[in-house]
Amino acid sequence: MTHKNIIVFTLFLIFNLSCFVGFSSEIIPNPDSRIFKTGDFFLSKETKINYSDNFKISAEFLKDFLMIDTNIDKYSNQINFLHKDINNDEGYILEILEKNINIYSENNKGAFYAVQTLRQLLPFQFETNKSSIREFKLPCQIIKDSPKFKYRGMHLDVSRHMFSVDFIKKYIDALAMLKFNTFHWHLTEDQGWRIEIKKYP
């Protein structure tokens, strides 16, 4: 099985398991609640991102993903990272309004998973050729979510199968988008060690 097929099979399996329990949403995993509102938010290169230092990692990730600026302009629509007690450090509220997208969470963990949900709502072109996208319309909605399981892991056996560094980076990125929080990396098998280290034989 090729590296690409492994990722495709993993995503296919997750999707079908979700369908088995009545899943009917493009958000994986299905959030605790999702309420649609009237109106749309227009995401473009002019959209600004507003955040405090507590949410810098998630905000910078989103900025790089969308390839937009982080300066505040009162005349443009905004994505705001805001603190709110959720009673779960990985929980979040994603509020998409006509003029603003508000991401509420207790800390950077919850904000990061909110960004992954927002990422899933965007067309696949954002994952590849962002430069071709001038503007995208997001329906107004409020999404609330928190993980049902504290440990959410995925395994990758590199002792029996060889993978490139680029593949492993993409694999971890896919796990993050699906809100896994643990990467179980099977590195050794008997005398085998699969990470190249120039200093040691």
Please report, for each region that a protein language model flagged, where it lies by residue:
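Sec-dependent N-terminal signal peptides
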Residues: I6-S18
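Enzymes and membrane/adaptor proteins characterized by extended Gly/Ser/Thr/Asp/Glu-rich
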Residues: R152-H161, I195-K199
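A conserved hydrophobic secondary-structure block that centers on an alpha-helix together
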Residues: D157-D190
